A protein has these predicted regions:
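Bacterial Sec-dependent N-terminal signal peptides
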Residues: 1-24
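Hydrophobic, Leu/Ile/Phe/Ala-enriched alpha-helical segments that form helix-helix packing faces
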Residues: 33-36, 66-73, 135, 163
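Short, compositionally biased low-complexity segments
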Residues: 3, 36-43
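Charge-rich, solvent-exposed alpha-helical interaction surfaces
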Residues: 28, 65, 131-134
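Short, aromatic-enriched amphipathic alpha-helices that serve as compact interaction elements
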Residues: 21-39
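Short low-complexity stretches enriched in small and charged residues
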Residues: 20, 54-64, 118, 126-130
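Short solvent-exposed beta->alpha transition segments
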Residues: 26, 42-99, 103-104, 110-112
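Exposed beta-sheet edge and beta->alpha loop/turn motif
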Residues: 91-197
Length: 197
C-alpha cells in the first residue's frame, strides 16, 4: 500500500513539475512577443534571444532589422501577440541544457504603399494579386486574405520556436524556420530541429 501511495505521489509531483515548467515557458514566450509588439526590441533581445543566434546576427543588427521592418514608409506592419498551440518539452537535457518546442500561431497585418497609393483600380488590383501570391507562397493558401475595407493583407502564420534554458527558469527563444535550418544547426541540437525537415 505504501508503495502505491509513493508511486502516485511521485507521478503527481513529476506531472506538476512538468506543467509548471510549461507554464513558465508559455509566460516568458508571450512576454518576449509582447515586447516585440510594443517595439521594445532591445529589451526583448536582451532577455529572450538565444546567445548562439546573436553570435551570427548581433543584437544591434537585429534591432536595426526590427526598426526597419516596423518603420518602413512603404508599408505599415503590425503583429499581434501569438496564440500558443502546444509546448513540447524535450525529454532529456542536451549538454546540460533543457529544450522545448513552442508551436504557435500569430496574426500580422500589412498595408503596402504600392496598393494604397496605386494610380488607378487596375494597378491596385495588379499589386494586390502580386503581393497576395507572394504571401500565399510563403504562409500557405488559406492563411492570407486581402481586407478591402482597410487595404491590408491579413496573414495567419503557424510557426515553431525553440526554447532553451540552463536552469529551467530563464528561457531563451529562437524562431525556427525551414529555410534557416543550416544556420540553426550552428547553435541548436539537430534533434530539436526535426520538425522542420
Amino acid at each position: 500500500m505504501k508503495k502505491i501511495i509513493y508511486i502516485l505521489l511521485l507521478s503527481w509531483s513529476i506531472v506538476t513539475f512538468a506543467q509548471s515548467n510549461v507554464k513558465v515557458i508559455e509566460n516568458q514566450f508571450l512576454d518576449y512577443n509582447q515586447l516585440i509588439v510594443k517595439k521594445d526590441f532591445s529589451k526583448a533581445l536582451d532577455q529572450y534571444a538565444h546567445e548562439g543566434f546573436l553570435k551570427f546576427v548581433p543584437k544591434e543588427t537585429m534591432v536595426l532589422i526590427f526598426d526597419k521592418m516596423f518603420n518602413d514608409p512603404s508599408m505599415k506592419f503590425s503583429l499581434e501577440v501569438p496564440t500558443i498551440l502546444k509546448v513540447e518539452e524535450y525529454p532529456q537535457k542536451i549538454q546540460n541544457i533543457s529544450y522545448a518546442k513552442v508551436f504557435y500561431s500569430q496574426k500580422m497585418s500589412v498595408e503596402l504603399a504600392d496598393v494604397v497609393n496605386a494610380k488607378d483600380a487596375e494597378e491596385k488590383q495588379k499589386n494586390i494579386n502580386l503581393y497576395l501570391g507572394a504571401f500565399k507562397s510563403q504562409f500557405g493558401d488559406g492563411n492570407v486574405v486581402f481586407n478591402e475595407k482597410n487595404n491590408q493583407f491579413e496573414v495567419m502564420s503557424y510557426k515553431m520556436a525553440v526554447a532553451n534554458s540552463n536552469e529551467g527558469k530563464n528561457w531563451k527563444f529562437t524562431v525556427a524556420e525551414k529555410q534557416q535550418v543550416e544556420l540553426l544547426k550552428q547553435f541548436l541540437p539537430e534533434e530539436i530541429l526535426n520538425d522542420l525537415k
